[in-house]
């Protein structure tokens, strides 16, 4: 690779390359107040297209999983987008639960056009209330009393005839039969007259036994007549019941006629009304209430209470009421428990026993969203495993079955009911992270069958004119909706630049709008304190500084350790086998760069590169891989004509918490080359970058934090104008450095070099060209590669002689044999 003496000048970045400054001069607005509120979302074309496909496919299984990071606006957008689709779709039906009069453990579901359920409930209630009075009035009417009197006369006549027959037989045994309130009773006679109590008590044993014997004979001979009396009594009761039912049926049918005509097109309503009328007629006696009985007998109060409870069977449960909707529902369930999703059966406790009926059936989000769209957060529903399983079962079965979970875990028994399942026709949208999606896709068998559409939200968007304007409109919308001060144009530009810094890419904007909105809220408090009408760029900068100040306690503690010399680091001078590497530390909300001294010792041996971090189990697998790549590079570069025989121990000094990643692999390689060649490295320059076996520099992460971290240390120890950072050229697009660092570069007090190959880096660090392999297979004398190659020959020379001696000994042994 050809390298000239101006390589530092060629590879040094200009100040304008360190950050892309947003200019809004082409836009006509002065503040975000001049802009319309954003409609839709910034970017996310892929996610929007997938969402559109999923929402418009109405087949089973085409539910949607929205994968994106929290704070990206995914939930708000999905909610709004679903509503935009739903507004063109019809309002689903109302649902009413009613008692199943054929099977008291079941309930029936009645579906009606939206808004009709309340009307049905009101009219059924009015009809029942009217019937309770109307039936009572009819059953105290002269018509009813006359009909009942005729039945009673016939009953008495038949009873009298049988009674006369009984007395004929009774006279033979000195007994007489009389009608009483308790029925027909037998009375012993004495001289043809009813026996008095005194006469009864004075009976001798013989007389008593004789009377007893006569009574038994009479009982046998009169059995048929008593059966006749019982049949007469039964016929009487049946006649009264028939009278009541006949009259009741006529009254009920007449009073339900109008209601039946009104709902004649709804078969489920007509079917229910038929069963309702039949049940009323069947229990017509419950409607015939004698208020005098209650007044005369206080104990009848309890019976009256039970009677009132009886009429609960005719009430209706307004299960789903869509009367207020104008289109298909969009339900966002924030607490998707089993009951909140699939509904529940509540209960009352009487004497320690749980009781329930159809009136206590409560709907769930699936019922309210039926015919439309249900939105839930994955983290919420997966934290309720019963709810997740219940949702999947409902989607697979295409119906919602309401069950009471509490009965399985309660010490009380509960009256059980079985609500009729509701047919399910809706679209479910689950919002989660990509990680949750992959877990479900790999480990949940039903997930792929039920959620066939994935809407993938990016973490970043292109930084183009369209999205910049969208960002400004988002800011306008957020300020307007939350009654905050609007932003001046320079404040918007500042946020655009910070948005790029959040994703460490000049060509991108963050999709994490929650952070942007939080900054606006905080900046508004500063603007309020300063009594300005709008938020300006200074307010944004102060906010960012305050946010960093809140979270950088650990970083400041690290800086103090560098300042007082606890951490050893040279930012000037030159040393052999020592170099400053760069790492990124994170405390959750805050990430920052921390320089680390890396040292290498080389000596004779065959161990190759000894990674001390690995030996003490302080390095991760990726870092270990990076170190092994170094051996590959050295072998590729210097061991084509000889064995690579040397030992180099490499360590991150004063590192006690472990290390992971390969971003320091090029840094380690420079230190090895310096140690082997015996050439000093400029300690003013810190290095970051990965390297492959061919010496090509590869990009890394956290470039802004690393550069700023080393800059802060140099500032602490004193800027000299020679300090800087060497980085991969591929990371130039990721540079969004703070203005302070950019100004230092502009003033010539700090430098940043972007390289693509190890040969470029070693020349910048040592001032000596790397040297390219010539035609004779040698490196030019005086170059780094020449010095390294010569030293490796020297380190491996004893091993070569030893190998030759061993070969001679083997040949001598063969000749002796």
Regions found by a protein language model. Give the residues of each.
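Conserved ASCE/P-loop NTPase catalytic core
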Residues: 2-441, 446, 452-464, 468, ...
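Peripheral, non-AAA+ core regions of ATP-driven protein-machinery
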Residues: 357-366, 372, 378-385, 389-391, ...
């Amino acid at each position: 690779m050809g390298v000239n003496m101006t390589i530092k000048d060629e590879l040094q970045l200009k100040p304008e390359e360190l950050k892309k400054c947003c200019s809004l001069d082409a836009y006509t607005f002065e503040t975000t107040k001049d802009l319309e509120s954003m409609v839709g979302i910034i970017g996310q074309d892929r996610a929007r297209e997938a969402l559109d496909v999923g929402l418009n496919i109405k087949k089973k299984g085409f539910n949607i999983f929205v994968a994106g990071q929290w704070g990206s606006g995914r939930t708000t957008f999905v909610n709004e987008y679903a509503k935009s689709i739903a507004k063109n779709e019809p309002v689903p039906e109302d649902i009413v639960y009613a008692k199943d009069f054929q099977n008291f453990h079941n309930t029936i579901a009645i579906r009606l056009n939206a808004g009709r359920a309340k009307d049905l409930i009101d009219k059924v209630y009015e009809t029942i209330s009217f019937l309770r009075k109307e039936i009572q009035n009819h059953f105290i009417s002269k018509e009813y009393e006359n009909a009942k009197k005729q039945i009673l006369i016939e009953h008495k006549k038949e009873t009298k005839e049988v009674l006369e027959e009984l007395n004929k037989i009774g006279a033979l045994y000195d007994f007489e039969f009389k009608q009483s309130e308790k029925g027909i009773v037998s009375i012993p006679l004495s001289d043809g007259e009813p026996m008095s109590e005194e006469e009864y008590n004075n009976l001798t044993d013989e007389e008593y036994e004789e009377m007893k014997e006569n009574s038994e004979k009479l009982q046998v001979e009169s059995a048929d007549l008593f059966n006749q009396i019982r049949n007469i009594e039964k016929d009487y009761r049946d006649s009264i019941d028939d009278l009541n039912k006949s009259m009741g049926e006529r009254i009920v049918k007449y009073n339900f006629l109008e209601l039946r005509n009104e709902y004649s097109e709804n078969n489920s309503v007509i079917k229910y009304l038929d069963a309702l009328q039949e049940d009323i007629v069947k229990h017509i006696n419950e409607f015939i209430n004698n208020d005098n009985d209650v007044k005369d007998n206080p104990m009848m109060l309890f019976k009256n209470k039970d009677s009132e409870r009886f009429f609960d069977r005719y009430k209706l449960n307004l299960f789903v009421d869509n009367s207020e909707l104008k289109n298909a529902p969009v339900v966002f369930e924030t607490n998707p428990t089993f009951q909140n999703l699939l509904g529940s059966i509540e209960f009352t406790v009487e004497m320690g026993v749980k009781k329930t009926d159809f009136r206590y059936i409560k709907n769930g989000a699936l019922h309210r969203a039926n015919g439309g769209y249900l939105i839930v957060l994955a983290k919420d529903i997966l934290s309720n495993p019963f709810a997740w399983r219940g949702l999947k079962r409902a989607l697979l079965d295409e119906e919602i079955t309401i069950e009471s979970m509490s009965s399985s875990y309660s010490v009380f028994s509960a009256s059980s009911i079985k609500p009729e399942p509701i047919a399910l026709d809706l679209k479910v949208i689950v919002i989660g992270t990509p990680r949750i999606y992959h877990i479900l896709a790999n480990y949940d068998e039903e997930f792929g069958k039920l959620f066939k559409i994935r809407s993938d939200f990016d973490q970043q968007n292109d930084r183009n004119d369209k999205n910049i304007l969208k960002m400004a409109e988002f800011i306008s919308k957020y300020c307007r909706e939350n009654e905050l001060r609007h932003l001046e144009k320079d404040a918007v530009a500042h946020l655009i630049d910070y948005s790029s810094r959040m994703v460490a890419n000049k060509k991108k904007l963050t999709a994490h709008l929650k952070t942007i909105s939080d900054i606006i809220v905080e900046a508004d408090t500063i603007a309020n304190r300063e009594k300005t009408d709008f938020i300006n760029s200074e307010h944004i900068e102060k906010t960012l500084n305050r946010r960093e100040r809140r979270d950088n306690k650990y970083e400041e503690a690290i800086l103090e350790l560098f300042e007082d010399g606890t951490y050893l680091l040279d930012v000037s001078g030159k040393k052999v086998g020592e170099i400053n590497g760069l790492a990124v530390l994170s405390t959750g909300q805050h990430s920052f760069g921390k320089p680390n001294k890396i040292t290498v010792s080389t000596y004779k041996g065959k161990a190759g590169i000894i990674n001390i971090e690995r030996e003490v189990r302080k390095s991760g697998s990726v870092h270990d891989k990076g170190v092994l790549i170094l051996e590959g590079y050295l072998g590729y570069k210097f061991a084509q004509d000889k064995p690579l025989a040397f030992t180099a121990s490499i360590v991150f000094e004063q590192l006690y918490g472990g290390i992971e990643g390969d971003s320091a692999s090029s840094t380690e390689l420079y230190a090895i080359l310096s140690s082997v060649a015996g050439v000093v490295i400029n300690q003013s320059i810190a290095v970051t970058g990965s390297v492959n076996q061919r010496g090509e520099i590869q990009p890394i992460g956290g470039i802004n934090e690393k550069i700023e971290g080393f800059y802060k240390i140099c500032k602490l120890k004193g800027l000299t104008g020679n300090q800087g950072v060497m980085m991969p050229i591929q990371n130039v697009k990721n540079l969004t450095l703070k203005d302070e660092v950019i100004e230092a570069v502009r003033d010539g007090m700090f430098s940043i070099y972007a390289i693509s190959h190890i040969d470029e880096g070693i020349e910048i660090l040592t001032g000596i060209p790397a040297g390219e392999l010539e035609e004779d297979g040698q490196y030019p004398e005086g170059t780094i590669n020449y010095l390294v190659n010569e030293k490796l020959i020297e380190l491996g020379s004893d091993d070569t002689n030893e190998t030759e001696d061993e070969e001679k000994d083997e040949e001598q042994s063969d000749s002796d044999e």
